């Protein structure tokens, strides 16, 4: 077998996966003096569990979480960090919770222990995002990569089916773009295909049952673990750039934006992909036209499939495209204003070309 030259960078996070694995958090915190625990109030029972095991004085609970991580929230949380003299960060929650922990790690250089309760995948990456008045800024820094990640399906089992649908589609977007990334490699590529298979299987179960069963949950959680891993390993392209612009600039729900955009972005890229890549998409999504498969998966789970449905205004299409084109980045297909405007028009109306 002949391999093309490739580069691969692995990133070191220790992962605990399985039911009731949350107990590892208390053991890991025994090495620190005081933890800054970010968790919404609905997750307070898990915070109380840590307090019971370690003592109230060693756990500082911060419950404010806002999508897209506004800098004002970071300032508030950082001030509490300093006042309480904490020395480690614990994030129990979804992408916004983990995103706040990452923003604080940038300033404090403290380690992160992440316990994801959605399928966003942020817990496996060195990518951070912060929103200011000028919009959303993203970057990479090794300090924001959680040292430990605990995947406990018990914590995700109560997720509403609607959130499970959009959150798993968010994870699917990472896998999709890793497959056609300009800097992909055999390891990331194969993992991406496997992750996509697991997510699709979980989505089919979710759609059939209408509720998040433990079987579907574990498939989706494993797929999201792989999705986060590959998101960290290779570069993302048009889909992620557009999602950050629509979410950060226009205030749209993060996972819903990912859910809606995917089919239309893959259709935009389709002609630029190699036959082998196209064939692999067809195989893992079990469909002769994968963009349509993604649209059908979202629709079958009751997830949004149009930009209009998630509050985006048609008059903002050109503005969004201009922002996306302002800075160059690698993408399988040449990015043109006309092409991207046409893509968003289709996404707004919910109509693929075929």
Question: Which positions does each model-derived feature cover?
Answer:
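Active-site segments that bind and position negatively charged phosphate/pyrophosphate groups
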Residues: 182-296
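A glycine/threonine-rich phosphate-anchoring loop and its flanking beta-alpha core
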Residues: 12-13, 106-190, 195, 276
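C-terminal charged capping/lid subdomain of soluble metabolic enzymes
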Residues: 2, 284-354
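Structural motif
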Residues: 14, 34-36, 60, 87-90, ...
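Short glycine/serine/threonine-rich phosphate/pyrophosphate-binding segments
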Residues: 22-25, 44-47, 71, 96-103, ...
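A short, small-residue-rich loop immediately preceding and capping a beta-strand
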Residues: 81-104, 108-119
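ATP/NTP phosphate-donor binding region
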Residues: 1-87, 307
């Amino acid at each position: 077998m002949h391999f093309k030259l490739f580069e691969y960078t692995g990133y070191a996070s220790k992962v605990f996966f399985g039911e009731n694995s949350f107990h590892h958090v208390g053991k890991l915190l025994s090495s620190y003096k005081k933890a800054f625990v970010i968790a919404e109030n609905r997750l307070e029972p898990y915070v109380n569990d840590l307090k019971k095991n370690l003592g109230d004085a060693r756990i500082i609970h911060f419950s404010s979480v806002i999508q897209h991580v506004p800098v004002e929230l970071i300032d508030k949380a950082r001030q509490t960090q300093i006042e309480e003299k904490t020395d480690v960060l614990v994030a129990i929650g979804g992408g916004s919770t983990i995103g706040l922990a990452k923003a604080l790690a940038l300033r404090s250089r403290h380690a992160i222990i992440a316990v994801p309760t959605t399928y966003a995948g942020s817990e496996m990456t060195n990518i951070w995002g912060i929103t200011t008045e000028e919009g959303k800024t993203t970057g990479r820094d090794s300090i924001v990569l959680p040292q430990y990640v605990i995947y406990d399906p018990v914590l995700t089992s109560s997720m509403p089916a609607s959130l499970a649908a959009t959150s798993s589609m968010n994870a699917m977007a990472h896998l999709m773009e890793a497959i056609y990334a300009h800097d992909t490699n055999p390891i990331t590529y194969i993992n991406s295909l496997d992750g996509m298979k697991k997510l699709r299987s979980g989505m089919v179960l979710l759609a059939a049952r209408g509720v998040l069963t433990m079987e579907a949950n574990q498939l989706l959680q494993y797929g999201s673990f792989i999705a986060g891993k590959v998101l960290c390993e290779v570069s993302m392209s048009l889909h992620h750039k557009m999602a950050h612009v629509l979410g950060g600039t226009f205030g749209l729900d993060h996972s819903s934006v990912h859910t809606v955009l995917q089919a239309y972005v893959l259709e935009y890229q389709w002609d630029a992909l190699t036959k082998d890549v196209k064939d692999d998409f067809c195989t893992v999504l079990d469909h002769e036209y994968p963009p349509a498969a993604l649209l059908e998966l979202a629709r079958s789970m009751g997830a949004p499939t149009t930009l209009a449905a998630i509050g985006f205004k048609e008059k903002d299409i050109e503005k969004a495209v201009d922002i996306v084109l302002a800075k160059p980045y690698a993408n399988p297909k040449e990015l043109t204003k006309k092409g991207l405007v046409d893509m968003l028009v289709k996404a707004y109306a919910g109509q693929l070309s075929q």
